[in-house]
Amino acid sequence: MSNLTLAQYLQQKNGNLTPELAQVIETIANSCKKIDHAIQKGALADLLGSAGNENVQGETQKKLDVLSNDFLIDALKVHPHVGGLASEELDEFTPGQQDGKYLVLFDPLDGSSNIDINMCVGTIFSILPAKNSITQTQDFMQAGTEQVAAGYVLYGPSTMMALTCGEGVAFFTFDPESQTFILTSDAIQLDADTQEFAINASNQRHWEEPVKRYIDELLAGKTSVRGKDFNMRWVACMVADIHRILCRSGIFMYPYDLKDPSKAGRLRLMYEANPMSFLIEQAGGSATTGRVRIMDIQPNDLHQRVPVIIGSKNEVDLVTSYH
């Protein structure tokens, strides 16, 4: 693997990757470097613990949630090619620049409940084409198939970015010495079959019958119709769980459950499900709600929630068929 920097990689890409889009991606990456630095400081900079507020999702915000959100908004709202941006942490979208070509949506710090115990967290982003010279909320209501780029940054033992611009998936590793993201894997592909699954099993009593059936079969292992044993993994950070799947295949599930029937699912379509679905599909996997392809959903709200079943194609197809 050549030691291409993220900037060099973007310069070499064709297709729908315009120079303007490359600049937006680099701006997101630079903001994530700041987030990474803040996470590394942690308690030394008094950045652990709650900020004392709730976000639009009704979740208690961590100090690093707020700081990460500010880093991204401050950089993107003044970017000449960003017409508007939307954050999981804020109720309304933030206007960008008139005639900006792109809209950016992001979850600034996924898995923030892991912060105080020094476990993995991440940033997720999605980029859509802008529809008008002056952005309105309705301009964000685009299906996931309209995404021109998506990715995440995982803040783990090493800091890594996964990126797709619609032509496969690449991994970049952050080099703290040069302060650059370096291409370390290209053409990431999932196996169609797997023996690993990720789900929060504490919600089992609330699941629909198709999901209960599927998980029961996995847990029965060799003694079931599956004829093989499975291992369960759960990090409580979607970025970390999806990164594992991109590295060694698997299936991730946050299905519809009856714990709160007013919610169609737990994960946010625009900030989590769509960008992760784009990555997984570009790596040869599948992503559905259990009933429909996630990227075909027409959004009706910036903070719309959906069930998510995503990963190795044959497993996703099987559990979807049970619905």
Curated annotation (Swiss-Prot):
Swiss-Prot/TrEMBL catalytic activity: beta-D-fructose 1,6-bisphosphate + H2O = beta-D-fructose 6-phosphate + phosphate
Highest taxon, organism lineage: Bacteria
CDD domains noted in UniProt: FBPase
Enzyme Commission number(s): 3.1.3.11
InterPro entries (UniProt xref): FBPase_C_dom (IPR044015), FBPase_class-1 (IPR000146), FBPase_N (IPR033391), FBPtase (IPR028343)
Binding positions for Mg(2+) 1 per the UniProt entry: 88, 107, 109
Pfam families on file: FBPase (PF00316), FBPase_C (PF18913)
Gene Ontology BP terms: fructose 1,6-bisphosphate metabolic process; fructose 6-phosphate metabolic process; fructose metabolic process; gluconeogenesis; sucrose biosynthetic process
GO-annotated molecular function: fructose 1,6-bisphosphate 1-phosphatase activity; magnesium ion binding
Reported cofactor(s): Mg(2+)
Cellular-component GO terms for this entry: cytosol
Binding note for cofactor: Binds 2 magnesium ions per subunit.
Subunit structure: Homotetramer.
Name this polypeptide is given: Fructose-1,6-bisphosphatase class 1
Organism of provenance: Acinetobacter baylyi (strain ATCC 33305 / BD413 / ADP1)
